[in-house]
């Protein structure tokens, strides 16, 4: 995790505060501890960008996207851990920051990674309540992004497992059944028969995602998928 955020912990022996400035991590990042409810969070950021892959996180951090966009970048590293979900929940709840998810356009990214961030894992509702981010919104990559940003030749065919996962979500998952916009997006993906990774934008240049895609999308945050 990196960006305009100060995390205040305490020395377990002396009780003295320990302040971690997450804009001063060099080429690295702040590691979210497994237990983080005791931490004090201070930030001037405008939003949180939760990113699926380490590669994209590192690229955005290297180019200091968090500085130009005044946001906090969080690497989910696939399906986000309970600690990551709890930390992002606190950013959303305690600091009142909007949370946007940036994952691959495939059934796994949508139905596993994003869904887990948004509503939690398959555990009980009581447990999920503290380890999910109900206010999170899906920025992309969406099936419509493939068309809008002309990524058709940077896609891959959906695998049988992808088709099965998307159809199962449409038929059996209450979350996706609750949102017509998600039903439309998943059906669009199935009709197109393709998936796209975050790295697909590199067809337009290595910095396209930073200079074009993200700025365009963030301006339309109110239109993000629920």
What does each of the following model-derived ranges do?
Residues 1-98, 107-226:
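Nucleic-acid enzyme cleavage-core boundary/entry regions
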């Amino acid at each position: 995790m990196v960006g305009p955020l100060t995390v205040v912990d305490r020395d377990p022996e002396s009780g003295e505060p320990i302040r971690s400035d997450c804009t001063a991590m060099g080429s690295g990042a702040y590691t979210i501890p497994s237990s983080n409810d005791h931490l004090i969070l201070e930030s001037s950021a405008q939003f949180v960008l939760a990113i699926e892959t380490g590669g994209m996180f590192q690229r955005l951090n290297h180019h200091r996207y968090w500085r130009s966009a005044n946001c906090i970048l969080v690497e989910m590293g696939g399906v986000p851990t309970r600690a990551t979900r709890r930390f992002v929940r606190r950013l959303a709840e305690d600091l009142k920051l909007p949370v946007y998810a940036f994952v691959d356009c495939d059934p796994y990214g949508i139905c596993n990674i994003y869904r887990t961030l948004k509503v939690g894992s398959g555990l009980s509702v009581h447990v999920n309540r503290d380890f999910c981010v109900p206010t999170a919104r899906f920025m992309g990559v969406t099936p419509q992004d493939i068309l809008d940003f002309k990524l058709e030749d940077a896609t891959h065919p959906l695998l049988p497992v992808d088709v099965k996962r998307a159809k199962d979500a449409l038929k059996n998952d209450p979350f996706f059944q609750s949102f017509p916009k998600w039903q439309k997006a998943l059906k669009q993906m199935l009709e197109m028969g393709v998936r796209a990774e975050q790295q697909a934008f590199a067809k337009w240049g290595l910095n396209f995602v930073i200079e074009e895609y993200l700025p365009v999308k963030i301006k339309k945050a109110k239109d993000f998928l629920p």
